[in-house]
Structure formats: structure tokens, C-alpha cells
């Protein structure tokens, strides 16, 4: 069974998650195919796919335009397939329920906008990658963390919040769903 993973990534965490999903799908007997829609916006939808996993980061209450454009352009190819979607954000790592609810709401709005009704959708906690930010973004991100009560304020370090067990469980659930299709 061939499963396409179409994703977008800015600082690399969504790409890392997509790669982990690919590994978990392989472990389940699937053949994963990866397309980074930011780097390959003209990539075609591979033939004979049995399912689609799509996802990307949530930045400034939006998912990447390149991901939306690619999914919209290939709607006919994935519309009849089992689909799963993942959203990556720092809000998903928040201890505040309102932040988590907001991340869910923005993800659902994105899905509604592109006409996607995935069988499985999740928000994964992302990462705070100070080492990849410029001068201004480092300070903005630090202030956001500080205002939300976070403690990860040392800008000389990166902080990863992704629950890799949750990522692998998501991939396993989707592989089982695709395998159960006639």
C-alpha cells in the first residue's frame, strides 16, 4: 500500500514529523512517498496511492499557503482516498486549554477552506527552534513563551515538545485504516 505524505515546513519540525510518520508507515508495511509542498509546489500527485497524509505548521494562525494550494490543485486525486491531517504548533504544547482549542479551531477552518474531511486529524506539539530564528523572531517567540507562562526562555537553546509516541500512533492508526479499505 502506497501512502503519500504531503507537507510543508518552515523551521524543520513539520518535516521531522513527516519523516517520522513515513518511518512508522514503513514499519506497518506501507510504502510512504514524501512531497514537501514548499520545495516542490509543482509536484504531481503520484499514481496508485492508497491514502494521503497531509500536514504542516501553524504560524500566525495560518497553515502554509503552499500546502493549501497544492492540496487544492490535487483535490480530484485525493478526494476518493482515505485522508489524515496533522497540524504542528506551539499552541498544542500549551498548558492552557484555550490555546489548544484555538489550534484545533484554526486547523478545522483550514480543512473547511480546502474541502478536506480527514478520517483522522490531530494537532502535534511543535518545537521552539531559537537557533533557526533571526534576531527579531527570537525575541518575539521568547515574549510569546513568556506571556503564556512558559519557562523555555533561554534563546541559546532549542526546545522540542513533539510527543513522538503520539506521532507513531497516528501513523499506525492511519495505516490500519488504509489497509482495511476494499
Please give the residue ranges for each predicted region.
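Short, glycine/serine-rich, charged loops/turns that create anion-binding
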Residues: 10-11, 39, 90, 128
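FMN-binding flavodoxin-like domain, especially the glycine-rich phosphate-binding loop
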Residues: 16, 28, 47, 51-52, ...
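A short beta-strand-loop structural module common to alpha/beta enzyme folds
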Residues: 28-41
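A structural signal for isolated positions on well-ordered beta-strands in alpha/beta enzyme cores
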Residues: 2-4, 33, 84, 120
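N-terminal beta1-alpha1 ligand-phosphate binding loop
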Residues: 2-30
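Conserved beta-strand termini and adjacent loop/short-helix elements that scaffold enzyme active sites
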Residues: 6, 35-37, 124-126
Amino acid at each position: 500500500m502506497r501512502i503519500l505524505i504531503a507537507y510543508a515546513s518552515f523551521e524543520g519540525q513539520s518535516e521531522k514529523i513527516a519523516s517520522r510518520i513515513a518511518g512508522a508507515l514503513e514499519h506497518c508495511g506501507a510504502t510512504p512517498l514524501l512531497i514537501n509542498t514548499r520545495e516542490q509546489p509543482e509536484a504531481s500527485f503520484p499514481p496508485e496511492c492508497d491514502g494521503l497524509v497531509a500536514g504542516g505548521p501553524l504560524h500566525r494562525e495560518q497553515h502554509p499557503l503552499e500546502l493549501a494550494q497544492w492540496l487544492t490543485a490535487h483535490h480530484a486525486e485525493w478526494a476518493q482516498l482515505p485522508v489524515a491531517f496533522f497540524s504542528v504548533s506551539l499552541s498544542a504544547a500549551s498548558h492552557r486549554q484555550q490555546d489548544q482549542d484555538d489550534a484545533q479551531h484554526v486547523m478545522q477552518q483550514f480543512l473547511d477552506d480546502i474541502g478536506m474531511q480527514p478520517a483522522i486529524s490531530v494537532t502535534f506539539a511543535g518545537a521552539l527552534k531559537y537557533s533557526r530564528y533571526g534576531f527579531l523572531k527570537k525575541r518575539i517567540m521568547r515574549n510569546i513563551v513568556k506571556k503564556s507562562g512558559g519557562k523555555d526562555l533561554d534563546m541559546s537553546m532549542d526546545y522540542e515538545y513533539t510527543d513522538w509516541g503520539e506521532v507513531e500512533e497516528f501513523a499506525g492508526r492511519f495505516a490500519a485504516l488504509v489497509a482495511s479499505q476494499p
